[in-house]
Amino acid sequence: MGKNRKSKRQLVRDEKRAKKREREIEHEEERDIKKQRREEAQQEALAPAAADYVPPPLDGTYDENAFSSAPEGRRGPNTNFEREFFGMLAEEEQEYFRHADELLELNDFPSAEERDIFLQNVYKEMRGKELKLASSQSCSRLMERLILLSNTRQKKSLFDAFGGHFISLVTHRFASHCCEKLFLQSAPVVTQELSGEYEQEPLPEGEEETEAMKSSMEDLFLLTLDELEEHLGFLLSDRYGSHAMRALLVILSGRPLDQAGTKSLLQSRKKEYITVEGAAANASELSSQIRAVPSSFTMAIKKIIDDSTATMDATALRVLAKHPTGNPTLQLLLELELTMFGKNKEKKDKKQKKDDDEAETKKEETQSEISLLGMLVPDAPAAFADNTTQAAEFVNSMIYDPIGSRLLETLITHCPGKIFKGLQQHIFGPRIQSLLRNDIACYPAIRVLNRLSREDLADAVEKSLPEMASFVDKGRFNVIKTLFERCNVRNGTDEINSLLKALTSAYGNDWKNIVPKLCMLDEEVSEEEQKPESTEEVGEEEAEEKKKQQQPKFQTQEAKNKAFMLNHGSQLVAALLTIPGQPSKAIQSSLAALKPAQVMKMATTSHNTSSILIKALQTPAITPTFHKVLVSSLLPHVYELATSQHGSAILNAIITLPSKPAEPNAPAVPFHMKENIISQLAQYERDLRETWLGRNVWRTWKGDLWSHRRHDWVRWAKETDPETARVAAAPKKREEKEKEEAEKKPKGYLGKNFDPKKAKGLAGNKKFEKKEVSA
């Protein structure tokens, strides 16, 4: 008993610990109460402004009681759903699936047959555990890889397994990615079934065909939409559910799934790219093109737009327009409404004007059809004339907002002509020059420039000319590029010359300064940039690892701004190069005046600058020696170019150009320069073969052909020459040569060795006559 008795010191220590724990509990409770009060205060402040609709927090958390005070009619039915918990995988199961994921990622299988057997076993093991697997942090990647490898029958069985739980899955951090992958991979099947090209896969032995396998993919998508229908208002701004909703909208509309614009709409930049060996074989060509979709999908889009906005008024939509997660979804809804239902709406409007008696009722129907646009800008375009109206206030509040301006860009791009004319006349037109100066408002203003008529564009250019120096100082090169391109499209030669004159004056009234300033060639090159991008001494993988270690983990804001300005400046140079006349001449003069070190910096620094040189080589020359001067600046650095990520593309472009121009000033590189390049490449053949970029250049230039059969290489290199030049360079017979030479000689020509003094003794003062030689 004495051993178990605590000492006085221990009792005092335990008492202190107990008091400390009590204080911590009280502090936590007090903090929770304050947090709850703060959330309630924020909700009360936003509730009247947002008409009882408040988007969920940005961190993805969702409080089931956060909307309890809002009326049921305004917040939509069953918004406060209870998320399901599907349980956790056992340790043995988790280890098995994790090992399977590693094997699929490494593709470490002795043969394709063993890989197929392994996949079949994984599918069998996964049966009945799909929900646990999809919501598992460590195994959801395996589910995505299996979806990429699944056939149509297996995808339908996954729809069956996920059915009834989609709302919990699409709002889950990990399962939402699996749902998106399933939706996107199943979209081409709808088109195949619609066109009759789909063939049912044979059922494996011992497996029964379920109702989902018998159903069409169209029905499975519609059943999924029915399940999500009650929660559309919540999914608009949910951190994970909004991505799944965007994916469904893109699928229903039939838009291409593999386009860059579609991918950026569906996923964030931080999204992990998951793939697996064999996924490309299962990929459908329909993903990269516009797909035919059934009429039920079009009706489903219309219903989604109506249901999503039915629970909100105009004020709630404005709150959603500035929400980081809800804004992209709202953009897509607005774009689909204007592009898919806009033309039908205009036709109905014309028919409605015929009947005066039913005008009011039909006007209400029209407003219901354009619910989203009508709620954002009511009574447009007439309302834009008064700055106090709801429509004008909405546009003015979105112009300078970094998130809301994106929705405004979509509205400007796709809105009907009447509404755009009102926007241009009353809001953007009078202050276009000040909007183009602003770093946020310039993007909606650029969208306006893309739709202006020739007269309005000339007026905008006239207002913008005094601001050219300000555009250059602030780096608004995208604005200058748009002005040049639109004037070129509208055939505004005078406006183009005025813009070029203003741009040149901003750079010291000298064309030679344009390219160095826009491409930042005047700045001192750091020691790291001066080193050639070669991997001569170390392997390619080691060089890449060393490069990654040298690069900072997080890019500073200054570096981001510099890269941003370099990108837009290079795009402006490339745009000017394609505009015939003075702009192209100015850029070619500036490129020809560059020093060899500056040309090499352009060739190896970035993709944007190297693409300028490629485009310059493919552009007709204003001066005959332009292409020759440009290539001669690169000749001393052929090996550095061949092992450079960006410079290798320039070498590959040079060999595709003809040696003799088909027309005067057409793109061409003299043949002796090509021979100089291939001879330098041959000196470094061994080093080139050690790198992927070097092998690519050697293969493109047909280096092996040069080494073993040089006359064949010469014939191949001259295949790009125009036909007349190749015929002229071909060897001819002796008789044909003599005949051509005789035709070229002037009449009365007596030959190269004819001596008139000797002819005097033979003929005297008489004319020289040719004697006939008898047989």
Curated annotation (Swiss-Prot):
One of its GO terms (cellular component) is preribosome, small subunit precursor. Pumilio repeats lie at residues 125-160, 161-196, 227-267, 390-425, 633-679. It holds the Pfam family PUF_NOP9. Gene3D superfamilies: Leucine-rich Repeat Variant. Residues 11-41, 345-366, 732-746, 766-775 have a biased composition (Basic and acidic residues). One of its GO terms (biological process) is endonucleolytic cleavage to generate mature 5'-end of SSU-rRNA from (SSU-rRNA, 5.8S rRNA, LSU-rRNA). Its main location: nucleus. Residues 1-10 have a biased composition (Basic residues). It is found in: Nucleus, Nucleolus. Residues 1-79, 345-367, 525-557, 720-775 are annotated as: Disordered. InterPro entries: ARM-like, ARM-type_fold, NOP9, Pumilio_RNA-bd_rpt. Keywords: Nucleus, Repeat, Ribosome biogenesis, rRNA processing. GO terms for molecular function: RNA binding. RNA-binding nucleolar protein required for pre-rRNA processing. Involved in production of 18S rRNA and assembly of small ribosomal subunit. Belongs to the NOP9 family. This is Nucleolar protein 9. It comes from Neurospora crassa (strain ATCC 24698 / 74-OR23-1A / CBS 708.71 / DSM 1257 / FGSC 987).
